[in-house]
Amino acid sequence: MALGITQFINIAGLLKDLKSFNFSVYGKWFGYINIFLCIALGIANLFHVSAVIAFGIVGIVQGLIILFIEIPFLLKICPLSDRFIEFIKRFETNGYRCIFYTLMAIVQYCSLAVMTTSLLVLGITLTISAVSYGIAFTKHQEFANTNIIKNPTDEDFPHDAVVREML
């Protein structure tokens, strides 16, 4: 039995999220996109022969931090220090996430002072996440998790036996 990515994605949850008009969910979606962009574009900018390398390294670190912020389940399964876990748990509200993403976007916009590179895309997508969380904060919307990724407690979630067969 082959295990596909579609077994972990809840299409009905995607439609439910779109209809909710909860901007914290939209911020979370862009957060997922930012994880990949930060790591990929951070690595891509390591090959410049200028100070942009420092911003590329910062981009990679930002991607890893966003990974733990947007996917809190990883805090339970990865061996991390208590100080790091406390730091990540500070960003469990829309207001703090708005501030966090804004500061990270500003750092990436500062890379433009050295050279215009693809890190500009990081600044833009981080800004979109910040704006989404900011709108959710100003509208007093509850912080919500997305329904796109299936919960391990769902009945149709692939369990250990399926993973063992795949391996």
UniProtKB/Swiss-Prot annotation:
<dbReference type="Pfam" id="PF10233">
    <property type="entry name" value="Cg6151-P"/>
</dbReference>
<feature type="glycosylation site" description="N-linked (GlcNAc...) asparagine">
    <location>
        <position position="22"/>
    </location>
</feature>
<feature type="transmembrane region" description="Helical">
    <location>
        <begin position="117"/>
        <end position="137"/>
    </location>
</feature>
<dbReference type="GO" id="GO:0016192">
    <property type="term" value="P:vesicle-mediated transport"/>
</dbReference>
<keyword id="KW-0472">Membrane</keyword>
<dbReference type="InterPro" id="IPR019365">
    <property type="entry name" value="TVP18/Ca-channel_flower"/>
</dbReference>
<dbReference type="GO" id="GO:0000139">
    <property type="term" value="C:Golgi membrane"/>
</dbReference>
<keyword id="KW-0325">Glycoprotein</keyword>
<feature type="transmembrane region" description="Helical">
    <location>
        <begin position="49"/>
        <end position="69"/>
    </location>
</feature>
<protein>
    <recommendedName>
        <fullName>Golgi apparatus membrane protein TVP18</fullName>
    </recommendedName>
</protein>
<feature type="transmembrane region" description="Helical">
    <location>
        <begin position="95"/>
        <end position="115"/>
    </location>
</feature>
<comment type="similarity">
    <text>Belongs to the TVP18 family.</text>
</comment>
<keyword id="KW-0812">Transmembrane</keyword>
<feature type="transmembrane region" description="Helical">
    <location>
        <begin position="23"/>
        <end position="43"/>
    </location>
</feature>
<keyword id="KW-1133">Transmembrane helix</keyword>
<comment type="function">
    <text>Golgi membrane protein involved in vesicular trafficking.</text>
</comment>
<keyword id="KW-0333">Golgi apparatus</keyword>
